[in-house]
């Protein structure tokens, strides 16, 4: 099974080698058919502490690194 890749915005970089990435998804409400926005925050591994708050990044699923970290940052978007 391929690893999932998500895009999101860095909302916190205060932890060492960790960033918190907010990923937004949009979907049609099943009854109202209105577009609804939902977001979720993922902790991702940032080995060199190079990503800052506001950066748009891609994160990829990986083996568990800690209790909460199961994602790693692979690239920043231009």
Swiss-Prot record:
Pfam families from the UniProt entry: Ribosomal_S17 (PF00366)
The superkingdom listed in its UniProt entry is Bacteria
Q: Which residues form a coiled coil?
A: none
Q: Does the keyword rRNA-binding apply?
A: yes
Listed A to Z, the keywords are: Ribonucleoprotein, Ribosomal protein, RNA-binding, rRNA-binding
Protein's GO biological process = translation
- List the molecular function annotations (GO) for this entry: rRNA binding; structural constituent of ribosome
Per the UniProt entry, the disulfide pairs are: none
Q: Which GO terms describe its cellular component?
A: cytosolic small ribosomal subunit
In terms of InterPro entries, this protein maps to: NA-bd_OB-fold, Ribosomal_uS17, Ribosomal_uS17_bact/chlr
> What's its job?
One of the primary rRNA binding proteins, it binds specifically to the 5'-end of 16S ribosomal RNA.
HAMAP family hit by this protein: Ribosomal_uS17_B (MF_01345_B)
- Family of the protein in this entry: Belongs to the universal ribosomal protein uS17 family.
Assembly description: Part of the 30S ribosomal subunit.
Name listed for the protein in its UniProt record: Small ribosomal subunit protein uS17
Instruction: Give the source species.
Output: Sinorhizobium fredii (strain NBRC 101917 / NGR234)
